[in-house]
Amino acid sequence: LRSVGPAIDVYKMIASLKPSNTNYAGTVQAAYSAYNMLSSTEKQYVTNFATLQEAKNNADSVQTVISKIAGISPTSRNYAKQVEEALAMYNSLPSAVRKLVTNYDALKSSQKEADTVDKVRQLISEINPNASNFESKLKSARSAYDKLSTQQKRLVSNYFLLEDYEAQLNNSSFFF
């Protein structure tokens, strides 16, 4: 019975794992370490080891998401892709552990910024110089672009089209 004691303690540690615990990752690691110190015979008595494995995977995934969000660079040409990937990773987490992502607010802010830039890119891509609404679409896109921060403006990959369309409009107005 004495050799079962440590196994029971580990079992209880695993049973008490709650994602709502502020030190969830540390508690998971402690339970994992305690399990690894058991003999192979004692490990057989820990019937909730699968729960520990799942908790460890979740804690590792949360840390991966936190690192991914921290690595988002607003100066990168791949900014929108970085935000999209981090958001997909966050959304793939079980809902019970999402609240453990300590920098989620930074991700939400980055997503909002990326969405704003995407809207401007979309406005520019919808401009058709042969359409009757060419000038109004051009003005809308220019207005939206001008409202962006300097940092956001750098992320508008099709800005050159906006400039080209404005040059076309200016050149065509000389002929009327």
Give residue ranges: language-model regions.
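Beta-rich interaction/scaffold domains
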Residues: L1-F176
